[in-house]
Amino acid sequence: MANYFNTLNLRQQLAQLGKCRFMARDEFADGAGYLKGKKVVIVGCGAQGLNQGLNMRDSGLDVSYALRKEAIAEKRASWRKATENGFQVGTYEELIPQADLVVNLTPDKQHSDVVRAVQPLMKDGAALGYSHGFNIVEVGEQIRKDITVVMVAPKCPGTEVREEYKRGFGVPTLIAVHPENDPKGEGMAIAKAWAAATGGHRAGVLESSFVAEVKSDLMGEQTILCGMLQAGSLLCFDKLVEEGTDPAYAEKLIQFGWETITEALKQGGITLMMDRLSNPAKLRAYALSEQLKTIMAPLFQKHMDDIISGEFSSGMMADWANDDKKLLTWREETGKTAFENAPQYEGKISEQEYFDKGVLMIAMVKAGVELAFETMVAAGIIEESAYYESLHELPLIANTIARKRLYEMNVVISDTAEYGNYLFANAAVPLLKEFMTKLQPGDLGKAVEGTAVDNAQLRDVNDAIRSHEIEKVGQKLRGYMTDMKRIAVAG
């Protein structure tokens, strides 16, 4: 099979990369109605599979789970989760032929096997759903022409999809219809109903394309969302310990620092995050972020180039075929780092202390968010998509580090995200080594001293922060998420 994106001509590639429209709330007036009375069969009962299914059932849909015979016979975790939550569970052969919508929520590397198993069983005119388009775009999976192919991609881990729904809200969501598979022209109606059934319409839905979702998702998770947090954690911890900081305190400052810092980012963008600093610290964080952007821009651009060309995907799929040798090696190496094995700090760190003593971490967040956004937009991805795949998801990933350090982050994210994270972090750590030797007192682990600032310089820095395009689009999109709950509780 050929990479689907690479079969398109340049005009088609640009059109699909640039497809992004914020949908009006009244477009979801029918809610999940289009799927009421129809049979939805979910394949896979992981975090997305279970939690989307619970939401869909609570929205009045008929939901069941198709699992492999071995998973049922051996009563594996997927079978237990589905049955314990009262869902009908059956084999592919038992459930797929009756399904009006088959939703494939298995891991990326399983998609080809799953789709090849379910396609022959699907009835004529049924629909196939994804929450990530890797199988269609990068693998180039060919789907029967009578089947409608749609995507509903919540911009959140599965657990958050459920929690926000239970609060009467939802999470921002991308929806799309595969242009090669919409024989009856009902793809958008199916996608809208599915998105509404998960609660996504209450937080904002972007009509996108499979191509735009995949390319932006890969870029975000590899760079700012996971790769930058991993590289930053390792670099900052080692620097603190090298300068004599208690390893336990250093570990806590970093583990919970990302979460606390990005909570401000979530509520008010880069502007609010920077406003939590004293004026001298803000000027220093800005200067550090500009240095970081200059150093890291080529690395961000390389990742975007490799994602657009398909180089990243082909390399990762080669590792799949080699029993994940690279992935598992990198995972093991991460588990052996000093940060992951540092003792726990039993004392308290106040919320403001995370900001005052984490100026470099704030600079890393600012630089990473802006670079990811700028690089995606330069590649033809629309600003709204770039925002969701950079700034919006960052607090959610930071929250996983707060739970169990980098181990938890890499467990929660997909194998695709984890592989890309290691690629980026393994390049970023040596790239930033020299930069780390030039830090000043007050950049990390100690507060910036003094209060004196130049008014004109502060004015110009404030203007530069607030006039960045990600701040403009972020203010608009956050207006649809006024019900967001507070994730972080400073440790």
From Swiss-Prot:
Positions annotated as active site in the UniProt record: 132
GO MF terms, alphabetically ordered: ketol-acid reductoisomerase activity; magnesium ion binding
Pathway: Amino-acid biosynthesis; L-isoleucine biosynthesis; L-isoleucine from 2-oxobutanoate: step 2/4; Amino-acid biosynthesis; L-valine biosynthesis; L-valine from pyruvate: step 2/4
Annotated residues for binding of NADP(+): 45-48, 68, 76, 78, 108-110, 158
Binding site for Mg(2+) 2: 217, 389, 393
Transmembrane segments: none
Superkingdom of source: Bacteria
UniProt-listed PROSITE patterns: KARI_C (PS51851), KARI_N (PS51850)
Catalytic activity: (2R)-2,3-dihydroxy-3-methylbutanoate + NADP(+) = (2S)-2-acetolactate + NADPH + H(+); (2R,3R)-2,3-dihydroxy-3-methylpentanoate + NADP(+) = (S)-2-ethyl-2-hydroxy-3-oxobutanoate + NADPH + H(+)
Gene Ontology CC annotations of this record: cytosol
Residues in KARI N-terminal Rossmann domain copies: 15-208
EC number(s) on file: 1.1.1.86
Cofactor annotation: Mg(2+)
Pfam families: KARI_C, KARI_N
Residues that coordinate or bind substrate: 414
Record-linked SUPFAM superfamilies: 6-phosphogluconate dehydrogenase C-terminal domain-like, NAD(P)-binding Rossmann-fold domains
Positions that bind Mg(2+) 1: 217, 221
Domain (KARI C-terminal knotted): residue spans on this chain: 209-344, 345-484
Keywords tagged on the record: Amino-acid biosynthesis, Branched-chain amino acid biosynthesis, Magnesium, Metal-binding, NADP, Oxidoreductase, Repeat
A Gene Ontology BP annotation from the UniProt entry: isoleucine biosynthetic process
UniProt function note: Involved in the biosynthesis of branched-chain amino acids (BCAA). Catalyzes an alkyl-migration followed by a ketol-acid reduction of (S)-2-acetolactate (S2AL) to yield (R)-2,3-dihydroxy-isovalerate. In the isomerase reaction, S2AL is rearranged via a Mg-dependent methyl migration to produce 3-hydroxy-3-methyl-2-ketobutyrate (HMKB). In the reductase reaction, this 2-ketoacid undergoes a metal-dependent reduction by NADPH to yield (R)-2,3-dihydroxy-isovalerate.
Similarity comment: family membership: Belongs to the ketol-acid reductoisomerase family.
Protein name: Ketol-acid reductoisomerase (NADP(+))
Gene from which this protein is expressed: ilvC
